[in-house]
């Protein structure tokens, strides 16, 4: 993703400090999407995505943990998946964790920041994508830990295995004696 620009490292701090201003800036930027946003929107699942979905369909792959936010695994047919860094096609309440498809979530520029639609929840809504500096939602961490504990084989594919907490899961599995398969163009 660095080919098309990197998101700011202080994005969550900016959001948390002034969510209204963050949303105003986001609405202004949506008129001219970044190269990064355009590249993600144009991306299509590749044979790797389809291959993993097929492994799940035939019962070889039980669950997929991904750091990708592009929804390509789901679009390829993956069913059992945890998107540890969220999904850019969804919105999420920062307080209760409720989620909505981005296409169905209406943001009123006159009433920012947008608030949760769940009854009795005053939470602020943002993109489901986890920003730099933002805590990963607890339910995603719980599910990743749960699936790691259940794994009888663990594959890491196309990752440097350096971004935590995702990098801890193959290590935890290996410490339990679970076979680890690494598919990566570079040694990690």
Give a label for each model feature.
Residues 1-188:
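Conserved catalytic core of sirtuin-type NAD+-dependent deacylases
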């Amino acid at each position: 993703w660095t080919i098309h620009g990197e998101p700011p490292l202080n994005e969550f701090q900016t959001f948390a400090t002034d969510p209204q201003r963050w949303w105003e800036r986001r609405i202004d930027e949506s008129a001219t999407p970044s190269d990064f946003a355009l590249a993600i929107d144009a991306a299509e699942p590749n044979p790797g995505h389809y291959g993993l979905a097929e492994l799940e369909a035939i019962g070889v792959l039980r669950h997929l943990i991904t750091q990708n936010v592009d929804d390509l695994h789901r679009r390829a047919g993956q069913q059992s998946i945890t998107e540890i860094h969220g999904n850019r096609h969804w919105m999420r309440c920062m307080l209760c964790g409720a989620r909505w498809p981005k296409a169905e979530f209406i943001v009123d520029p006159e009433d920012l920041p947008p608030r949760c639609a769940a009854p009795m929840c005053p939470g602020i809504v943002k993109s489901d994508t986890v920003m730099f500096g933002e805590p990963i939602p607890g339910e995603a961490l719980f599910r990743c830990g749960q699936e790691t504990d259940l794994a009888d084989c663990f594959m890491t594919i196309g990752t440097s295995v350096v971004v935590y907490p995702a990098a801890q899961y193959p290590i935890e599995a290996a410490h339990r004696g679970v076979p680890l398969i690494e598919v990566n163009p570079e040694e990690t």
